[in-house]
Regions:
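Conserved small/polar residues in nucleotide/adenosyl-binding loops
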Residues: 157-159
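Glycine-rich nucleotide/cofactor/substrate-binding loop typically near the N-terminus or early
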Residues: 33-102
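Short, acidic/small-residue loops that bind anionic groups at enzyme active sites
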Residues: 40, 125-153
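Short, ordered loop/turn segments at secondary-structure junctions
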Residues: 9-11, 39-45, 79-80, 112-113, ...
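Short Gly/Thr/Asp-enriched flexible loops that form oxyanion-binding sites at enzyme active sites
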Residues: 19-23, 113-131
Length: 159
């Protein structure tokens, strides 16, 4: 079974931790995920291979319920933007190498505009390089009501 890695970036909010909790629950309950890891401090945590085993740290429903209602960003955050993969392929190659080294087949990144840009660039890189053993997904959230082109967004209700 492949492992799942979740990371968060951008502004902290209570909804961002609730998302992490949902990812942990879904990973555990799916029966298709080996371990659920969290990258500390966003994509920088991925690049630095700074992971925590979330299904061990949050091994009870009570711990996950507390995380879900805890404000801030439990995994930490960053404001790092990935460059253009055509100009800086090394950064993308390193991310793929690290994900494969840790047997990660699912990467979920939650955050705002820059985070979704990271998801987009990494997804396109995987597609263009026929990387089909890693699925990259975004969980959009905003505290600024500035995230367009999505019908669902964490942290803020769009009216």
């Amino acid at each position: 079974m492949k492992n799942l890695l979740v990371a968060q970036s951008g502004g902290p909010s209570a909804a961002i931790n609730a998302t992490i909790t949902g990812v942990i629950d879904a990973g555990i309950e799916s029966g298709r995920v080996g371990h659920v890891y969290g990258a500390l401090n966003g994509i920088k945590g991925v690049l630095n291979e700074n992971f925590v085993n979330l299904d061990e740290v949050c091994d009870t429903k009570e711990k996950r319920d507390l995380l879900a209602i805890t404000p801030a960003a439990a995994l930490g955050s960053c404001r790092w933007k990935l460059g253009d993969p055509k100009e800086n392929a090394e950064e993308f190659e390193e991310i793929i190498r690290i994900l494969r080294k840790n047997d990660i087949g699912y990467f979920i990144y939650t955050g705002g505009n820059d985070s979704m840009d990271t998801v987009y660039k990494l997804s396109v890189y995987c597609e263009e390089h026929n990387i089909d053993d890693i699925k990259v997904m975004g969980a959009p959230k905003t505290i600024d009501n500035d995230l367009g082109e999505t019908d669902h967004c964490l942290s803020l209700i769009h009216i």
